[in-house]
Amino acid sequence: MKIDSKNRLDIALLILRLGIGFLFILHGYPKMMGGIEKWAGLGSYGMGSLGIHFFPTFWGFMAAFSEFVGGIMVLLGLYIRYFSVLLIITMLVATCSHLVGGDGIMGASHAIESAVVFTCLFILGPGKYSVNINLKQ
């Protein structure tokens, strides 16, 4: 494959999706496999920082799901805009949790950076080299 001005953006999107998707699979897997206790703790910490104390297990599961399944979907480029929204919301909650928890901007920087990446993926879409594009053909 020759890199030229016609496919440069698509190759960059592929590299971005593969990298961030893989990392979110790694981050989300232990949370997803942690079960109910892990989800409840995650939900209590995350949503509790926003003053939301009901259904902590549900919120924790949603965070784990969005990171693990969202990572898979981003890696594949499948339904990327829907999963980008889930991941943006998850990263905004993580940002708030770090800031309220006293970690400061440096503690929240990973979540902020990830939210920026997923915002860009939401705007740009998956690119030409994705499962989503191949399903449409």
Please give the residue ranges for each predicted region.
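Extended, low-polarity transmembrane helix blocks
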Residues: 1-37, 54-65, 69-137
